[in-house]
Regions:
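Residue-level signal for inorganic ion chemistry
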Residues: 95, 145, 178, 212, ...
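N-terminal Rossmann-like NAD(P)+-binding subdomain of aldehyde/semialdehyde dehydrogenases
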Residues: 1-70, 83, 90
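Short, well-ordered alpha-helix to beta-strand connector turns
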Residues: 141-143, 163, 206, 262, ...
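Conserved C-terminal structural/oligomerization subdomain of aldehyde/semialdehyde dehydrogenase
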Residues: 1-19, 114, 119-120, 277-396
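Short glycine-enriched loop/turn motifs at secondary-structure junctions
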Residues: 139-140, 170-172, 202-205, 238-240, ...
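Rossmann-like NAD(P) dinucleotide-binding subdomain of oxidoreductase/dehydrogenase enzymes
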Residues: 23, 58-186, 348
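ALDH superfamily catalytic-core signature
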Residues: 8, 118-122, 153-285
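Short, charged/polar "capping" segments at the starts of alpha-helices
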Residues: 106-112, 217-218, 334-339
Length: 396
């Protein structure tokens, strides 16, 4: 049974108040979010959050999750508002208590955000900025645990909640694949927008762009021109999509990578460690010499040329990478869509940002991208908390 109708009405009115508060106090909220995010990405995050809150009633009607007592959330270090909506606000429709441990990387901003949201509506959530050990003690017998972050860390934390439904939200390679039939101008604009979301500091940003060798020169020329038009400056100024990075150590990581790839840089390449800044940079490789593809968390565009689409499929499905499959954006290669759908959530002629919907399952089929664990059984699939709660607790 879900909450009785009267109780559900109270919960929905609470979310209505939250939506109203976000809209009314948007300037204050933007001031908080732009401590970490660029102004434009913060605005996009607010709009996505409102859209998800507006879809909450339909979501819980669709999946019909039963009432549970407690969710423990190991919160993300980025997209703080949107994550809060997904992991706390929406679950408040079917969960009595939500305990949140903020990421230490974004602690002060998360405290401000939590205080702001609690002023708008009395969501049954508590923010607990304490150690993992103390949080585990306080979380007690949680019905559900939500963990974002490092895959290896998730496995360690999961072992401490053997009875809980454990949901892991991670990251992936998120390739763009651009074929001979692609609309290059459109593909380039979406490629840039996806890579520079919050200056590249997002786990959905693409980390590699596979481009058919016959389209290489045209794509690179278009891509570089689109990059040249980007506004650069302080993150809290509207229109500035590239800014100094927020998270410590990212510019050092980028510098190390770009030093290794210096002979392949065709645009950009400057790094300023003193302000944690990485210039938008284009690196070009062939598939044979691709090297390691890492999660940059900064505006590096790694363009990799290929001759045959099956080469790309084989590379993505290699044993050392198949567990990192989350999303793939396919442009002008319709025959690839079905080949990748068994392992990725696929966007055709769109980016992952274009298709994400907070009221529907999202993610890939690699354990390092996302998984659900219950009673010792690990399964990777696109996740949505209400759906997973319904599947496990609705059986009782």
């Amino acid at each position: 049974m879900i909450f009785a109708t009267k109780e559900r009405d109270v919960q929905l009115k609470r979310l209505d108040k939250l939506i109203s508060g976000i809209r009314t106090n948007k300037v204050e909220l933007l001031d908080i979010l732009t401590e970490i995010a660029t102004y434009d990405s913060a605005e996009a995050e607010i709009e996505s959050s409102i859209a998800t809150l507006l879809g909450a009633e339909e979501e819980v009607e669709r999946y019909n999750p039963p009432t549970i007592d407690r969710i423990a959330v190991y919160h993300s270090s980025n997209v703080l508002l949107y994550s809060y909506v997904l992991y706390a606000a929406i679950p408040s429709l079917f969960c009595k208590e939500i305990l949140i441990r903020p990421s230490t990387k974004a602690l002060s901003t998360m405290v401000k955000l939590h205080d702001f949201l609690m002023k708008q509506a009395d969501i049954p959530s508590q923010l607990l900025p304490i150690s993992q050990r103390k949080f585990r003690e306080q979380a007690g017998q949680s019905d559900v645990v939500v963990f974002t972050g490092n895959y290896e860390n998730s496995l360690k934390v999961q072992q401490t909640y053997p009875q809980a439904l454990f949901l892991y939200f991670g990251a992936g390679i998120n390739p763009f694949i651009i074929g001979e039939k692609a609309n290059i101008e459109d593909a380039s604009k979406r490629a840039v927008a996806a890579r520079v979301y919050n200056s590249g500091q997002d786990c959905m940003c693409p980390n590699v762009y596979f481009v058919h060798e016959n389209m290489k020169e045209r794509f690179l020329a278009t891509l570089i021109q689109d990059i040249k038009e980007l506004q650069i400056g302080k993150r809290n100024v509207p229109g500035n999509v590239i800014a100094p990075l927020f998270y410590e150590g990212l510019s050092e990581q980028a510098q190390d990578y770009l030093t290794q790839m210096k002979d392949r840089i065709v645009y950009g390449g400057a790094v300023d460690l003193s302000i944690n800044y990485v210039e938008p940079t284009v690196v070009v490789s062939s598939l044979e010499k691709i090297g390691e593809v890492i999660e940059f968390f900064c505006p590096i565009f790694h363009v990799v040329t290929y001759r045959d689409e099956q080469e790309v499929v084989d590379w993505l499905h290699a044993p050392e990478r198949v567990e990192s499959t989350l999303g793939a954006s396919v442009f002008g290669v319709p025959e690839l869509v079905e080949k990748l759908r068994s392992t990725h959530i696929v966007s055709e002629n769109l980016s992952l940002y274009d298709i994400e919907n907070g009221n529907h399952p999202f993610g890939g089929y690699g354990l390092q991208a996302n998984y659900v664990c219950h009673q010792g059984n690990f399964t990777s699939r696109p996740l949505l908390i209400s759906k997973e709660v319904s599947a496990v607790f609705g059986r009782k």
